[in-house]
Every structure is written in structure tokens, then in C-alpha cells.
Regions:
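Conserved catalytic cysteine-centered active-site region
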Residues: 24, 56-111, 141-147, 157-163, ...
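Flexible glycine-/small-residue-enriched beta->alpha junction loops
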Residues: 111-169
Length: 401
């Protein structure tokens, strides 16, 4: 079996909801990092790309009709390069990277672009068709995040807890205190601030140029969501989003964001053929299921499953990129994996609480950030893992080469 190498990885800045990227169509946003890969790797014959695997959790708006295919075309890839869209909700783009690696390892592909996109700002309101003449069953649904067009059997059998409600469930089941959640959130903000000040994100972010009605175009080159000046006292004053005395708040949860990310994966033969520099190889990926109402705990069983398959341990990981959907689930997972709350390996440059969580792009962002961190520190292994709505977890391990 051949190796699957990551040769390049780039992302847009992650924008706030209604922020700097609000005016960028989802399909145009998806194309930006792919176009950057093309510009950064002039030795590649782009007609030789076997496929584009792109994650997207919505698909109801401008990201409809297979945004993976549209992103490739809009980025200028030859029409001969196919594309597909993968939807595993929050884990979509991490799944895309893992599936690309599997295709290359099996020998079915030599060169694949994998990544994902989400414009949560531009997620539309949608209305289903009435089920009969003069019916009053039609209703408008907001597709930004969470449940819509709920199946009554799903509600009856599994419940339809909102994402914050699932985080409260995890906090209660695993006894994660509010103070610990706020401390986790502060660490995320502080670590992002330190990494930003050191210029760590410059190598992974491609600026987005936005034309203005008057004057020069606006250039967005920095993540918009972080709040580095947040204090523990300010977080403590926030009310719970599920219930007034709840532990999950806007301050210890990830954001609703816009962004895109893309990676170039290649076989050893493609690396040699196109003069690419292999930066890491994908060792494996695993997924796991659990009750939807505690979906945030998903990274723990997924990570344990993958590490067992690889014959590895959590102690071998030099970097652990755990998507911070909520501080509550992040702490429940790290504690179950035997990690200290402030383990320096976990999100060393901040996580989604600071950076943001544009659903379909976040997994690829984890791999991109982990890759750069391994190269900066000389580390060898990185674990990237996420929780997924409706009760799943996903994990992927890379090795620096």
C-alpha cells in the first residue's frame, strides 16, 4: 500500500457571522484556497488531479449542486477534474482528507484536493413544499445550524437537543464545572493571541480580497472571531444559553462562522512526478457513533478507536487538535483520554472557541494548523479530532515527514 502525503494546505481567514466575509458567496469562498494551491504549486499538471473532495454541512444555499465540483471550476481547475461534496456535518472536511488519503493508499488516485467550506452567514431560510392542497404544514426553516425538517421518529427515539443543549448534557454527565469551562475558553483565546502575535498563522492563511463600491478593495487576512482581551471575570458574568443557571455560554462555545480550507494530497509517485515536497503523511482515520444528545463526547471513542487501529497511544501525540465546539465537551473528551485540562499539546495555538467553527471547513483547518505546528516544533505525530452533530466523532492522525 502506498503512502498518502500532504504536500500543501491553506485556508481563508475565518470570519464572524455577518462579518468581513458575509458578502462572499459560499461557492466563491470555497474556490479561494483551491486557487491558492494552484498558484503555490506551479509544477503540478492540474489536469492530473483525480478528484476534489470538499466538505460542506449545509448545501441549501449557494453551496447547493455539489459545491466541491463548483469550487474546482471556479478556482480554475481544468473541466476534466471532477469534484464531490461530503457531508458529515462538523466532520465533513476531516472526512474529506481521510477519504482522499484512503483513495491514494488504495492506488485508485494519485493526486486529490481535499478540504471544505461553510458560509454560515449566508445559510438561507428554506421552506418545504406543502404535503397537500391548501395545507398549512409548510414552514420556514433556518439552515444556519442544527435541526430542521425534523423527523418525528427521530424526535421520539433520540430527542432533538440543540447543540448547546447537548453540551449541557455532556457537562452534567461528565461533571464539567462552569469555572473549568471558562478557564478552557480563556486558554483558547490566549493561545490564539500568542500564536497570532508570533505570526504563526501567516503561512496557512490566504488573504481574501473583497471589492468595495468605492475605494480600494478590502483585504481580510486575519481570523475575525477571536476575542483576545476577554477576561475570566467577563466570562463569569455571561448567562447560560440553554438556561439562566446553565454552564454553557456564548463565551465558552465556538462561533458561527465563515471560511474555507484546502489541502493537496499526493502519492509518492505523484510527489516525484510533479516535484512536490511531502510535509506529512496520513496514517489513518476512524469514526464512531454515540447518542445524539451527548454528541460532543464523540472525539473520545473515535480517537481511541483510531489509536488502537494504529497501535499507538495518546502519549505519542506531539500535537492534539481537538475542535472546541464547546469547552464542556472539550474537557470531557480530554479528561477521558487521560489528559490534563491545560495540556500544552492540546490546541497549542488556540481552538474553535477563539478561531471559530465554520462547520464544513473546520476539520481541514485542524489538519492544516497541526501540520504547521509539527513543522515549527519538530514534532512527529498529530491527532485531529472532532465531535459531530447527531451523535458521531471523527479522528485522524498525521505524521510529519
Amino acid at each position: 500500500m502506498t503512502e498518502a502525503f500532504i504536500c500543501d494546505a491553506v485556508r481563508t481567514p475565518f470570519g464572524r457571522y455577518g462579518g468581513a466575509l458575509a458578502g462572499v458567496r459560499a461557492d466563491d469562498l470555497a474556490a479561494i484556497p483551491i486557487a491558492a494551491l494552484v498558484a503555490r504549486n506551479p509544477s503540478v499538471d492540474w489536469k492530473q488531479v483525480d478528484d476534489v473532495y470538499y466538505g460542506c454541512a449545509n448545501g441549501a444555499g449557494e453551496d447547493n449542486r455539489n459545491v466541491g465540483r463548483m469550487a474546482g471550476l471556479l478556482a480554475g481547475l481544468p473541466v476534466e477534474v471532477p469534484g464531490t461534496t461530503i457531508n458529515r456535518l462538523c466532520g465533513s472536511s476531516l472526512d474529506a482528507v481521510g477519504m482522499a488519503a484512503r483513495a491514494i493508499k488504495s492506488g485508485e488516485a494519485q493526486l486529490i484536493i481535499a478540504g471544505g467550506v461553510e458560509s454560515m452567514t449566508r445559510a438561507p431560510f428554506v421552506m418545504g413544499k406543502a404535503d397537500s392542497a391548501f395545507s398549512r404544514s409548510a414552514r420556514i426553516e433556518d439552515t444556519t445550524i442544527g435541526w430542521r425538517f425534523v423527523n418525528p421518529l427521530m424526535k421520539q427515539q433520540y430527542g432533538i437537543d440543540s447543540m448547546p443543549e447537548t453540551a449541557e448534557n455532556v457537562a452534567e454527565q461528565w461533571t464539567v464545572a462552569r469555572a473549568d469551562q471558562d478557564a478552557f475558553a480563556i486558554r483558547s483565546q490566549q493561545r490564539w493571541a500568542a500564536a497570532h502575535a508570533a505570526g504563526f498563522f501567516k503561512g496557512e492563511i490566504v488573504p481574501v480580497t473583497i471589492p468595495q463600491k468605492k475605494g480600494d478593495p478590502k483585504v481580510v487576512d486575519t481570523d475575525e472571531h477571536p476575542r483576545p482581551d476577554t477576561t475570566i471575570e467577563a466570562l463569569a458574568k455571561l448567562k447560560g444559553v440553554v438556561k439562566p443557571d446553565g454552564s454553557v455560554t456564548a463565551g465558552n462555545a465556538s462561533g458561527v462562522n465563515d471560511g474555507a480550507c484546502a489541502l493537496l494530497l499526493a502519492s509518492g509517485a505523484a510527489v516525484d512526478k510533479f516535484g512536490l515536497k511531502p510535509r506529512a503523511k496520513v496514517l489513518g482515520m476512524a469514526t464512531a457513533g454515540l447518542a445524539p444528545r451527548i454528541m460532543g463526547f464523540g472525539p473520545s471513542p473515535a480517537s481511541k478507536k483510531l489509536l488502537a487501529q494504529l497501535g499507538m497511544t495518546i502519549e505519542q501525540m506531539d500535537v492534539i487538535e481537538l475542535n472546541e465546539a464547546f469547552a464542556a465537551q472539550g474537557l470531557a473528551v480530554t479528561r477521558d483520554l487521560g489528559l490534563a485540562d491545560d495540556d500544552a499539546r492540546v490546541n497549542p495555538n488556540g481552538g474553535a472557541i477563539a478561531i471559530g467553527h465554520p462547520l464544513g471547513a473546520s476539520g481541514a483547518r485542524l489538519v492544516t494548523t497541526a501540520l504547521n505546528q509539527l513543522e515549527r516544533t519538530g514534532g512527529r505525530y498529530a491527532l485531529c479530532t472532532m465531535c459531530i452533530g447527531v451523535g458521531q466523532g471523527i479522528a485522524l492522525v498525521i505524521e510529519r515527514v
